[in-house]
């Protein structure tokens, strides 16, 4: 499936895409390829935009359209393992590029491995990935506070692990306990945080599909 997604990405019309998985963008004849055919989505991308495969190339990205695949496989190391180009750095670079469009832009930033930590019932994994995501959110809020015309929405499509926070006295600096109900997804309601113009539209309880509908209304 990843090889097909790589082809669709190369054929798409978008401005910025940063992530991993360069092995799916090069033909099987190239060392490190994860494809089983001779298709070369990477060449198609390079004909359209600036492309980075290394941290050095990423730092040099300047074009209005840019792509980066910074790992061979389709995921990055854990936040705790360290990686030169963090989610925050990718977010700031994306904002730098997209903000040059005077028609505005839409940017989605995902902290994908928070979910993986939930599946593993690994609190330290969840914590580290949440902190990395929080840094990325901070980058967006820095931009929005200066721009004063950017709506920021932070949410999730589901909760994973059925995590519960147990006893502990915050004022006494006691460690708070926790437990998990499942290694799968739960039906727990997820929070929605918003900041900027029309942020009040996203308060209260709502179906998660309403978020997208409201965003389209604002875009129009």
Where are these regions (language model features)?
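A post-motif C-terminal structural segment
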Residues: 1-220
């Amino acid at each position: 499936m990843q090889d097909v997604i790589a082809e669709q990405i190369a054929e798409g019309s978008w401005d910025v895409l940063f992530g991993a998985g360069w092995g799916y963008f090069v033909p099987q004849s190239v060392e490190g390829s994860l494809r089983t055919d001779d298709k070369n989505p990477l060449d198609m991308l390079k004909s359209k935009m600036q492309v980075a495969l290394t941290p050095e190339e990423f730092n040099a990205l300047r074009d209005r359209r840019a792509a980066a695949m910074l790992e061979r496989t389709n995921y990055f190391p854990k936040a705790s393992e360290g990686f030169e180009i963090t989610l925050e750095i990718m977010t700031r670079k994306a904002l730098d590029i997209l903000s040059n469009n005077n028609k505005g832009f839409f940017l989605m930033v995902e902290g994908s491995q928070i979910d993986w930590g939930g599946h593993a019932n690994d609190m330290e994994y969840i914590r580290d990935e949440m902190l990395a995501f929080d840094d990325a959110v901070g980058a967006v809020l820095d931009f929005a506070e200066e721009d004063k015309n950017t709506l920021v929405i932070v949410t999730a499509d589901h909760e994973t692990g059925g995590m519960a926070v147990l006893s502990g006295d915050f004022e006494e600096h006691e460690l708070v306990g926790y437990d998990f109900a499942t290694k799968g997804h739960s039906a727990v309601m997820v929070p929605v945080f918003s900041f900027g113009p029309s942020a009040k539209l996203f308060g209260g309880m709502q179906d998660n599909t309403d978020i997208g509908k409201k965003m389209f209304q604002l875009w129009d």
